[in-house]
Amino acid sequence: MEESAASGGYHMLKPADKQDVYPLSSAQKRMYVLNQLDRKTISYNMPSVLLMEGELHISRLRESLNQLVNRHESLRTSFTEADGEPVQRIVEEASIDLHVFDAEEGEAEQKIKEFIRPFDLSGAPLIRAALLRIADQKHLLLLDMHHIIADGVSRGIFVKELALLYKGEQLPEPKLHYKDFAVWQNEAGQKERMKEHEQYWLSVLSGELPELDLPLDYTRPPVQSFEGDTVRFRAGSGTAKAIEKLLAETGTTLHMVLHTVFHVFLSKISGQRDIVIGSVTAGRTNADVQNMPGMFVNTLALRMEAGEKQTFAELLEQAKETNLSALEHQEYPFESLVNQLDLPRDMSRNPLFNVMVTTENPDKEQLELQDLTISPYEAHQGTSKFDLTLGGFADENGIGLQLEYATDLFSRETAEKWSEYVLRLLQAVAENPNQPLSSLSLVNETEKQTFLEAWKGKTLPVPTDKTVHQLFEETVQRHKDRPAVTYNGQSWTYGELNAKANRLARILI
């Protein structure tokens, strides 16, 4: 996730007048609509697991959780409709149960999966907690919230405050709550301020929008299930150092490099150059909301078209400009953009893009309390909001990467192979960023020879109702920018070869 750029956009944020119900923010509205379409989905749950090692006082933990719930209005919020519009209602007081279960170490993953289940948005609080007792001195705290009340930053706020409350510290009362932001966002003045941002996004996404055509293992189902899995892999310290040098020389970020690498990868497996890749921003552009729990994260649609003769370094510079411009206009709600573009509704895919790139700081912070250590515990949710999501982070061991994929569309074997391709591209451009995009290969020489041997002597059936040049023209339409012929070190794409053939044909006619 890219850091939010500083902005003065929230300078008029103030406590809202007390009401029975409050409007939803733009991001909340989209979450509400998605939940109404499928109330059994867990794709917008936000589970987290904390490993607690040492002397744990369960009664104190239970009390601290309920103090946290009553400290933040967002944790006491429910969602319903009034006059045909979704609204949020805040209850004055709420409580959650902390269910305690005994479990073996090997049972933890299954217990975590069983813990994650759909939320009913009409009933507050939209947070659950459970405790797995693995041993006397080892517990797993399971927390789950709905995305409509929180984001990744919120989760970090909750964990730190929970630890402080457990220690018995008195925390200052929040001056502002998320409903204050939602009311502010719905004011007429803010809608007017959004017009400049709106014009930027409508300009970037003007004309015919590209639809990424990925090679699928399975037929796309009519309704997206959001079921997924993840392949985790790493770039070693050598590649990480080379990338650090590249970042310093180009003034770019790891997010920009991964965006560019992912674009090249997607272009090579799809044959398309004009691609929209999603990204996210924390959306907290003012100090007043830095420690406010709620749904601030915004989605950005990064559209980029690679040139036929570009090098990776040139495309990286383009990605830098694309990302910086997008961050300048990040306040415009993605939900409003989707509505303005009037995209056709398709339950089988996401609007605007089906792939995403993210970068986040790894959550490895340990909290040391008296006789108790709290640290993150990695658990996989088993969902994928998009066809593919490339995630990355830098740490002391290099660069950590993960490819999340929709299991309705791709096999594990394909995802693992594509992870190797992404890593190969990253290693290649780290070593030499000035390579032409056309020279970057997903496969190594051994794999090339294996493919050639596998196809040697094989024939494929061809349509008998079309001429050779018609079949070639159709191939050009599908793979215009892919290499078609290589001879004596020179390469021509299908588009270039077709242009040469047409020139020769005009001479002969």
Where are these regions (language model features)?
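Key residue(s) within conserved catalytic/signature motifs
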Residues: 5, 11-16, 20-22, 59, ...
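Conserved AMP-binding/adenylate-forming core of the ANL superfamily
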Residues: 413, 470, 484-509
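Non-catalytic N-terminal regions of enzymes
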Residues: 1-6, 64-112, 165, 177, ...
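4′-phosphopantetheine-dependent carrier domains
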Residues: 1-9, 48, 164, 249, ...
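A Lys-centered signature of the CheY-like receiver
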Residues: 151
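Adenylate-forming
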Residues: 29-39, 47-56, 65-67, 81, ...
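Regions immediately C-terminal to embedded phosphopantetheine-bearing carrier domains
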Residues: 1-36, 63, 176-180, 197-199, ...
